[in-house]
């Protein structure tokens, strides 16, 4: 049975892990969200999130955005190659509804997979 959990091993936790992704990454982006990724040696993808106060002022809005992105990653983790991924949220994402945000992030997962495989 396929597991759809989001355990600690699926997260980027340390500053060193985040920093490694910023050096020569594979990119997939839209106007509101950028995905940066590098191949990892694990048997699964890992996710790191950054939602700056500069773009999303209220904590509840930042938490909502992170929750939607984490949930999308959790459900699509088996379709994503073995990459360390950092999601950068930019201006304009706060006005998006959850369904619209989910649709955008799923499109970016596919775009990132194509760039990695192709």
Curated annotation (Swiss-Prot):
Keywords: Endonuclease, Hydrolase, Nuclease, RNA-binding, tRNA processing. Its EC number is 3.1.26.5. InterPro entries: Ribosomal_Su5_D2-typ_SF, Ribsml_uS5_D2-typ_fold_subgr, RNase_P, RNase_P_CS. This is Ribonuclease P protein component. GO terms for molecular function: 3'-tRNA processing endoribonuclease activity; ribonuclease P activity; tRNA binding. RNaseP catalyzes the removal of the 5'-leader sequence from pre-tRNA to produce the mature 5'-terminus. It can also cleave other RNA substrates such as 4.5S RNA. The protein component plays an auxiliary but essential role in vivo by binding to the 5'-leader sequence and broadening the substrate specificity of the ribozyme. Belongs to the RnpA family. Pfam families: Ribonuclease_P (PF00825). GO terms for cellular component: ribonuclease P complex. The keyword Nuclease applies. Gene3D superfamilies: 3.30.230.10. Consists of a catalytic RNA component (M1 or rnpB) and a protein subunit. The gene is rnpA. NCBIfam families: rnpA. The keyword Amino-acid biosynthesis does not apply. It is an enzyme of class 3 (hydrolase). It comes from the Bacteria. It catalyses: Endonucleolytic cleavage of RNA, removing 5'-extranucleotides from tRNA precursor. One of its GO terms (biological process) is tRNA 3'-end processing.
